[in-house]
Design a protein with these regions (language model features):
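Sec-dependent bacterial lipoprotein signal peptides
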Residues: 1-17
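A structural "domain/chain start" motif
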Residues: 13-58, 163-170
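Short secondary-structure boundary/capping segments
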Residues: 26-28, 64, 111, 117
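Sec/Tat-exported extracytoplasmic proteins
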Residues: 55-59, 105-109, 153-165
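Short acidic low-complexity segments
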Residues: 60-71
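Surface-exposed short loop/turn segments
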Residues: 73-118, 124-140
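C-terminal/domain-edge helix-coil "capping" segments
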Residues: 133-170
Length: 170
Protein backbone atom coordinates (compact mmCIF):
# COMPACT_ATOMS: atom_id res chain seq x y z
CA UNK A 1 0.00 0.00 0.00
CA UNK A 2 2.81 2.38 0.88
CA UNK A 3 4.54 1.72 -2.46
CA UNK A 4 1.34 2.53 -4.40
CA UNK A 5 0.95 5.80 -2.55
CA UNK A 6 4.62 6.60 -3.17
CA UNK A 7 4.27 5.88 -6.91
CA UNK A 8 1.12 8.02 -7.10
CA UNK A 9 2.79 10.93 -5.30
CA UNK A 10 5.87 10.61 -7.52
CA UNK A 11 3.73 10.64 -10.69
CA UNK A 12 1.83 13.71 -9.52
CA UNK A 13 5.06 15.50 -8.63
CA UNK A 14 6.60 14.78 -12.03
CA UNK A 15 3.44 15.85 -13.85
CA UNK A 16 3.24 19.04 -11.80
CA UNK A 17 6.84 20.12 -12.33
CA UNK A 18 6.59 20.03 -16.13
CA UNK A 19 8.97 17.11 -16.58
CA UNK A 20 8.53 15.19 -19.83
CA UNK A 21 10.42 12.58 -21.79
CA UNK A 22 12.91 13.74 -24.38
CA UNK A 23 11.11 13.97 -27.69
CA UNK A 24 7.72 14.72 -26.17
CA UNK A 25 7.22 18.44 -26.25
CA UNK A 26 3.80 19.27 -24.82
CA UNK A 27 2.21 22.41 -26.16
CA UNK A 28 4.41 22.56 -29.25
CA UNK A 29 2.70 23.31 -32.57
CA UNK A 30 1.94 20.25 -34.66
CA UNK A 31 3.71 19.69 -37.95
CA UNK A 32 1.07 17.19 -39.15
CA UNK A 33 0.94 17.25 -42.93
CA UNK A 34 3.51 20.05 -43.33
CA UNK A 35 5.87 19.31 -46.22
CA UNK A 36 9.46 20.21 -45.37
CA UNK A 37 12.85 19.33 -46.80
CA UNK A 38 16.22 18.96 -45.12
CA UNK A 39 19.20 20.17 -47.13
CA UNK A 40 22.82 19.75 -46.13
CA UNK A 41 25.69 21.61 -47.77
CA UNK A 42 28.21 19.18 -46.21
CA UNK A 43 26.74 15.92 -47.47
CA UNK A 44 24.16 13.41 -46.36
CA UNK A 45 25.68 11.97 -43.19
CA UNK A 46 24.32 11.04 -39.78
CA UNK A 47 23.01 14.49 -38.83
CA UNK A 48 20.77 15.10 -41.87
CA UNK A 49 19.49 11.51 -41.76
CA UNK A 50 18.63 11.72 -38.05
CA UNK A 51 17.02 15.14 -38.53
CA UNK A 52 14.79 13.81 -41.34
CA UNK A 53 13.76 10.86 -39.16
CA UNK A 54 12.86 13.06 -36.18
CA UNK A 55 10.98 15.62 -38.29
CA UNK A 56 8.94 12.77 -39.78
CA UNK A 57 8.10 11.61 -36.23
CA UNK A 58 6.39 14.97 -35.60
CA UNK A 59 3.91 14.25 -38.39
CA UNK A 60 5.58 16.35 -41.08
CA UNK A 61 6.15 14.98 -44.55
CA UNK A 62 9.85 15.08 -45.37
CA UNK A 63 10.30 15.64 -49.10
CA UNK A 64 13.30 16.12 -51.39
CA UNK A 65 14.37 19.77 -51.79
CA UNK A 66 12.31 21.66 -54.36
CA UNK A 67 10.78 25.07 -54.95
CA UNK A 68 7.68 25.90 -52.93
CA UNK A 69 8.63 23.76 -49.94
CA UNK A 70 10.14 25.10 -46.69
CA UNK A 71 13.68 23.85 -46.15
CA UNK A 72 15.79 23.41 -43.07
CA UNK A 73 19.28 23.96 -44.46
CA UNK A 74 22.28 22.61 -42.53
CA UNK A 75 25.22 24.88 -43.31
CA UNK A 76 28.00 23.45 -41.14
CA UNK A 77 28.72 20.63 -38.71
CA UNK A 78 31.89 20.50 -36.62
CA UNK A 79 33.21 18.26 -33.86
CA UNK A 80 36.17 19.62 -31.93
CA UNK A 81 38.10 17.99 -29.10
CA UNK A 82 39.85 20.40 -26.71
CA UNK A 83 42.22 19.30 -23.96
CA UNK A 84 41.05 20.57 -20.57
CA UNK A 85 43.55 18.89 -18.25
CA UNK A 86 46.30 16.31 -18.17
CA UNK A 87 49.78 16.37 -19.63
CA UNK A 88 50.55 14.52 -22.86
CA UNK A 89 52.16 11.61 -21.03
CA UNK A 90 49.61 11.43 -18.20
CA UNK A 91 47.59 8.27 -17.58
CA UNK A 92 44.36 10.25 -18.01
CA UNK A 93 43.54 13.30 -20.06
CA UNK A 94 40.30 15.25 -19.91
CA UNK A 95 38.85 16.75 -23.06
CA UNK A 96 35.77 18.76 -23.96
CA UNK A 97 33.93 17.61 -27.06
CA UNK A 98 32.29 20.55 -28.82
CA UNK A 99 29.61 19.71 -31.38
CA UNK A 100 28.50 22.70 -33.44
CA UNK A 101 25.84 22.97 -36.14
CA UNK A 102 24.95 26.05 -38.17
CA UNK A 103 21.54 26.08 -39.83
CA UNK A 104 18.90 28.28 -41.41
CA UNK A 105 15.23 27.91 -42.28
CA UNK A 106 14.09 28.90 -45.75
CA UNK A 107 10.37 29.49 -46.34
CA UNK A 108 8.33 28.10 -49.22
CA UNK A 109 8.73 31.49 -50.96
CA UNK A 110 12.53 31.23 -50.81
CA UNK A 111 12.89 33.88 -48.10
CA UNK A 112 15.02 33.20 -45.04
CA UNK A 113 12.78 32.74 -41.98
CA UNK A 114 15.58 32.14 -39.48
CA UNK A 115 19.32 32.00 -39.39
CA UNK A 116 21.98 31.39 -39.92
CA UNK A 117 21.90 30.16 -36.32
CA UNK A 118 24.70 28.34 -34.55
CA UNK A 119 23.87 25.62 -32.01
CA UNK A 120 26.57 24.19 -29.78
CA UNK A 121 26.67 21.32 -27.30
CA UNK A 122 29.64 20.35 -25.11
CA UNK A 123 30.43 17.22 -23.13
CA UNK A 124 33.48 16.16 -21.12
CA UNK A 125 35.49 13.09 -22.07
CA UNK A 126 38.26 11.37 -20.15
CA UNK A 127 40.73 9.39 -22.23
CA UNK A 128 42.79 6.78 -20.43
CA UNK A 129 46.16 5.90 -21.90
CA UNK A 130 45.71 2.22 -20.96
CA UNK A 131 42.21 1.96 -22.48
CA UNK A 132 42.38 3.71 -25.85
CA UNK A 133 39.79 1.46 -27.54
CA UNK A 134 37.29 1.97 -24.73
CA UNK A 135 37.96 5.70 -24.75
CA UNK A 136 37.40 5.83 -28.51
CA UNK A 137 34.08 4.02 -28.07
CA UNK A 138 33.03 6.47 -25.34
CA UNK A 139 33.92 9.36 -27.63
CA UNK A 140 31.73 7.98 -30.43
CA UNK A 141 28.83 7.50 -28.00
CA UNK A 142 29.24 11.07 -26.74
CA UNK A 143 29.21 12.41 -30.30
CA UNK A 144 25.99 10.47 -31.01
CA UNK A 145 24.46 11.90 -27.84
CA UNK A 146 25.50 15.43 -28.81
CA UNK A 147 24.02 14.90 -32.28
CA UNK A 148 20.70 13.73 -30.79
CA UNK A 149 20.58 16.81 -28.56
CA UNK A 150 21.19 19.12 -31.52
CA UNK A 151 18.54 17.32 -33.61
CA UNK A 152 16.07 17.70 -30.72
CA UNK A 153 16.78 21.45 -30.63
CA UNK A 154 16.44 21.75 -34.41
CA UNK A 155 13.07 19.99 -34.44
CA UNK A 156 11.87 22.11 -31.53
CA UNK A 157 12.85 25.31 -33.36
CA UNK A 158 11.18 24.09 -36.54
CA UNK A 159 7.98 23.47 -34.57
CA UNK A 160 8.10 26.96 -33.04
CA UNK A 161 8.84 28.66 -36.36
CA UNK A 162 6.17 26.63 -38.18
CA UNK A 163 3.69 27.53 -35.44
CA UNK A 164 4.56 31.23 -35.80
CA UNK A 165 4.17 31.04 -39.58
CA UNK A 166 0.82 29.28 -39.28
CA UNK A 167 -0.58 31.82 -36.81
CA UNK A 168 0.61 34.72 -39.01
CA UNK A 169 -1.23 33.24 -42.01
CA UNK A 170 -4.54 33.01 -40.14
Amino acid sequence: MVSRVFVLVLMLALAGCGWHLRGSMPGMPSLDGLAVSVESVFGDGDLPSELRRQIARTGAVVVPPRAGVPAMRLLDEQVERRRVSGARGAAEQEFDLDYTVTWELIGADGQRLAGPVRLEQTRSLIIERDDLLGSEGREELLIEDLRRDIVFQLVERLQVLAGDALTEDE
